[in-house]
């Protein structure tokens, strides 16, 4: 491996060379820190060697970021956002891979809707993946067809911000997901204990008379699903 302060040549969004600008990764990696630093100072390549040079001072150079929870609101709520505009915003922020949630209209609980999202995502500048729902129409009553959704390209099963209150359904979902080697993501919050969404229960919520959401609502659901 190579760990040092070094020059990086980035072209077309790809790291083309690491190390001395007129050397290469292997040569730079084979030298000690002092030698590498010396070469970096003495073997600079002038800007004239490149058709375009972007000054990246003050910027961050990093691998593409990944957001595993996005809401592009497509289909059904495109007056808020759609896959194209969401992907453009992601790219502008340095995110090259995103995972769309299934709370669209219709819900991504069927192969047709899932394929719509994935196909539209292929036309954007980033990798657009999608979750599929655990339960049909997010009702928490009947499981979706995990197998066909996985085969169609789903990466994870989740009912997004809606907690699954049926313990038997959760157990069946876990068993099926395990058999298919697929991850599940649950919203672990029991609404029976919540007086007011959007604020934790505590001194401030009591002072404002809002009731709030106690930590107990989360503890109970997590404990149930870990048993």
Q: Which residue stretches match the model-derived regions?
A:
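Metal-associated gating/positioning segment near the N- to mid-region
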Residues: 57-121
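Divalent metal-dependent hydrolysis catalytic cores, especially in the metallo-beta-lactamase
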Residues: 84-108, 124-136, 150-165, 181-189, ...
